[in-house]
Amino acid sequence: MTTAARPTFEPARGGRGKGEGDLSQLSKQYSSRDLPSHTKIKYRQTTQDAPEEVRNRDFRRELEERERAAAREKNRDRPTREHTTSSSVSKKPRLDQIPAANLDADDPLTDEEDEDFEEESDDDDTAALLAELEKIKKERAEEQARKEQEQKAEEERIRMENILSGNPLLNLTGPSQPQANFKVKRRWDDDVVFKNCAKGVDDQKKDKRFVNDTLRSEFHKKFMEKYIK
């Protein structure tokens, strides 16, 4: 929006402005919009996903590192369990130290066992994801190969049909092909006036009729028979 119509609170006066003591000098008035605003060039940072940077990145390794960091953060935020009773002062026995007779499916697991179980489950999930990815890639490759093979077969079929339809001898051998017609089509200029003018015009006697051709007219025929032949 323009500010040209707004009033000036401090109009410019020659030689009487700020820092102007000489009346012979021209008055100078500056605005904040006249000052340079962008004095530095902005460069692309390393974290702005440049094409070269994206090509050189290992997304699988970064994903695995983020998963491990998230697991460590989750384990760090988990509150430690403190037991006030005298029976729970000592640490819980490990799973391998518990006799087989005392094992029960309802017994809770320790923190270390829980961490090991989570790491194993994460590894299993990663392996399952990679296997699913390889399966999808293989299915897409097979689908692409099948489509290319079908396209080649269709092109070959069309080419053979064109070859067979272009040869009339081969068309006659096919029972499903319609009977070919070798009759010569009548030309469009068969009944024009100036075609074969002197061919067989005197063999038969015809009734007098008007012909728009001086060489085929009755007067010309009589004149040629009388004075030329």
Curated annotation (Swiss-Prot):
Keywords assigned by UniProt, alphabetized: Acetylation, Coiled coil, mRNA processing, mRNA splicing, Nucleus, Phosphoprotein, Spliceosome
Molecular-function GO terms, alphabetical: RNA binding
Region annotation Disordered: where it falls in the sequence: 1-133
Record carries keyword Phosphoprotein: yes
Segments of skewed composition (Polar residues): 24-34
Comp. bias intervals (Basic and acidic residues): 52-84
GO cellular component: catalytic step 2 spliceosome; mitochondrion; nuclear speck; nucleoplasm; nucleus; Prp19 complex; spliceosomal complex; U2-type catalytic step 2 spliceosome
Positions bearing Phosphothreonine: 47, 110
Modified residue annotations for N-acetylthreonine: 2
Keyword Nucleus: yes
Disulfide links within the chain: none
Residue numbers carrying Phosphoserine: 121
A Gene Ontology biological process term: mRNA cis splicing, via spliceosome
Coiled coil: 123-165
Post-translational modification N6-acetyllysine, affected residues: 18
Location within or outside the cell: Nucleus
Biased amino acid composition, Acidic residues: 104-126
Pfam families cross-referenced by the UniProt entry: Cwf_Cwc_15 (PF04889)
Subunit comment: Identified in the spliceosome C complex. Component of the PRP19-CDC5L splicing complex composed of a core complex comprising a homotetramer of PRPF19, CDC5L, PLRG1 and BCAS2, and at least three less stably associated proteins CTNNBL1, CWC15 and HSPA8. Interacts directly with CTNNBL1 in the complex. Component of the minor spliceosome, which splices U12-type introns.
Role description: Involved in pre-mRNA splicing as component of the spliceosome. Component of the PRP19-CDC5L complex that forms an integral part of the spliceosome and is required for activating pre-mRNA splicing. As a component of the minor spliceosome, involved in the splicing of U12-type introns in pre-mRNAs.
Family stated for the protein in its record: Belongs to the CWC15 family.
Record's protein name: Spliceosome-associated protein CWC15 homolog
Organism: Homo sapiens (Human)
